[in-house]
């Protein structure tokens, strides 16, 4: 996605950041390049603001998901970072870890950690707030407990678990599994045969890959399914918990359309 001066004006960016943008990207720039430049110059707060704006505008766009993954891959291949880390743990704030090895084990406990991996079957755990985690290898395992974290995965058969609030999860690979019980979470999955389980409230879910399945016991504010997709969302009818079921192609449920449950517990466009 290309970010222009018009986007900055729409987002009501402050004067200092606006001037920085004009100096570095006078003709606009990609989300990944701008994010990387902000991180490199130490403007982590601005980078986080960029993430907030971009996710609000392009959450349902698969091209944005690719750029989100790309923005973290830059860290993994940065020669100034640590490219080999079969087992690595840090507890300091603002840690930056890049890893290209297979079967690596990475753990962080500090605030605003940035972790990027490109290897096969990597295991990543983070308990700090505002962490950014990117993985492009297959069969990655990611567990996050910190609020306001961001997880991006491009590999097939990834497994992601989250317990933090206001977390953003983005997956591109096929057969990915996502489990989340934090409130105010945004989940976007574009690969086929994804499985998403949610127990948090006020969550937005996109499962636009073919034959993906969503089950939620928490309140879902909106959901988008792909071809062959299905969803079961829990609600309370005043006496007991029941499930409203949506199956793409049945009862006017269409792929790529955003739905919510109305007061009658029926799926309606929103």
From Swiss-Prot:
Induction: Up-regulated by the oxygen-responsive transcription factor FNR under anaerobic conditions. Repressed in the presence of nitrate or nitrite via the two-component systems NarXL and NarPQ, respectively. This is Uncharacterized protein YdhT.
